[in-house]
Design a protein with these regions (language model features):
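Glycine-rich phosphate-binding loop
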Residues: 339
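Short Gly/aromatic-enriched secondary-structure transition segments
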Residues: 39-46, 224-225
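Short, charge-rich binding segments
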Residues: 44-46, 54-57, 103
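FabD-like malonyl-/acyl-CoA
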Residues: 128, 342-346
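C-terminal nucleotide
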Residues: 1-27, 52-85, 182-331, 346-386
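Gly/Ser-rich oxyanion-binding loop with an adjacent helix/lid
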Residues: 1-22, 28-32, 37, 41, ...
């Protein structure tokens, strides 16, 4: 993000005075998909694309907001019980309300912000906004005494209460806690986490956005969650002396023991979840050893599981995965909930240009539009820039 670009817009729209500048990143999730609601592990990292905001207290009880990208301006009172209608401004309003609930005496301020997180690419621009605004509020009104976890939770609460999205905690966590050159294994049950090195010399990490999103009949995500719950119920009945809260508590032998007691569909979905738990742990070990070939192998295994067992892929994503294999890409998989969106790819430097040319040309020839290409670097989390 260009600091001078944001600053020039802030000065133009707010009486010529400057404020403080803050940045919060989007995120990728290298591996660990559909594991959060099963009490498992996710493995995100912050990236070098995000949201930048300039903020300055204005001595009133009014928050004056300007979206540089949308060229839209909104104002609201700090104590307004309803808040603004514009969705983008409700992210700011929600964070103000959540900080007030934490006991922070938030006053009026001016804010202008812009982002370079590609929309629809699964890098969580919304969490980057919440984290950026939270970082600013913490610095300006709380003397940086609000914990990182509380900032992340305030972002999650903003989505739940003011945007109407029932998200998990991974996106906000990654944006707030990210570190340059580090991925984070987050235990979605205990919220304990650990940093792991990600410095793939000789490789690039790149997202390929299919730009398709399939709207399916029914509630495919809820259906898969219900499948997992069905298997947990069967496990509890079969093993009455053991407590099963989620599939996190099951091992392979226990899953096989209830195979005949659940539907084939529920079994294969649970099979994916147990396999994904093992793959996350294997990738952590591989990163410590600097073994990026194993990391890539596990990414391909996850894609296969998401496509054939969990059944959240689509023709376009499977095609991107196939083209990656044909071009010698070290690892490739669906990133995100599925049914469209991106693949995340680990590509050797000397194959990168050829892969990008081939995947762009082949996908365009087959589907009539070019995919979007986003190389990313694992970067620092939310911080004050200047």
């Amino acid at each position: 993000m260009d600091i001078e670009f944001v600053r020039s817009r802030f000065i133009k729209h707010f009486d010529g005075k400057t404020g403080n500048i803050y940045f919060s990143p989007g995120r990728i999730n290298l591996i660990g998909e559909h594991t959060d609601y099963n009490g498992g592990f996710v493995f995100p990292g912050a990236v070098d694309k995000g949201i930048m905001a300039e903020v300055r207290p204005n001595g009133t009880d009014t928050v004056m907001c300007y979206s540089i990208d949308l060229k839209d301006r909104v104002e609201f009172k700090v104590g307004d019980p309803e808040g603004p209608r514009a969705t983008w401004a409700r992210f700011i309003y929600g964070m103000v309300q959540e900080f007030k609930a934490l006991g922070v005496d938030v006053k009026g301020f001016n804010i202008a912000f812009a982002g370079d997180v590609p929309l629809g690419a699964g890098m969580s621009s919304s969490a980057a906004m919440e984290s950026c605004f939270g970082c600013a509020l913490n610095d300006l009104f709380a003397d940086n005494k609000v914990s990182k976890w509380d900032i992340a939770l305030a972002g999650q609460a903003t989505e739940h209460k003011y945007i109407g999205v029932n998200c998990g905690i991974m996106d906000q966590f990654a944006s707030v806690f990210g570190k340059e050159g580090k991925l984070m294994r987050l235990d979605c049950r205990s919220r304990e986490f650990e940093y792991f090195p990600f410095d793939p010399q000789g490789y690039k990490l790149v997202l390929v956005n299919s730009k398709v999103k399939h709207e399916l009949a029914g509630s495919p995500y809820n259906d898969r969650r219900k499948s997992c719950e069905n298997v947990v119920t069967a496990l509890g009945k079969h093993f009455p002396d053991k407590k099963f809260e989620t599939l996190r508590d099951a091992n392979w032998e226990e899953l096989e023991a209830v195979k005949a007691e659940v539907s084939a569909e529920d079994y294969q979905r649970a099979h994916f979840v147990l396999g994904e738990k093992d793959r996350v742990l294997a990738v952590c070990d591989a990163l410590v050893a600097g073994d990026y070939e194993t990391v890539g192998q596990k990414m391909y295994e996850t894609h296969y599981g998401l496509s054939k067992e969990y059944e959240v892929s689509c023709e376009e994503l499977d095609y991107l995965n196939d083209v990656a294999k044909e071009n010698g890409v070290t690892g490739s998989r669906i990133m995100g909930g599925g049914f469209g969106g991106c693949t995340i790819n680990l590509v050797k430097d000397d194959l990168y240009e050829t892969f990008i040319e081939n995947v762009t040309a082949k996908f365009n020839a087959k589907y009539g539009h070019k995919p979007e290409i986003y190389p990313v670097i694992i970067s620092e989390g939310s911080h004050k820039v200047c």
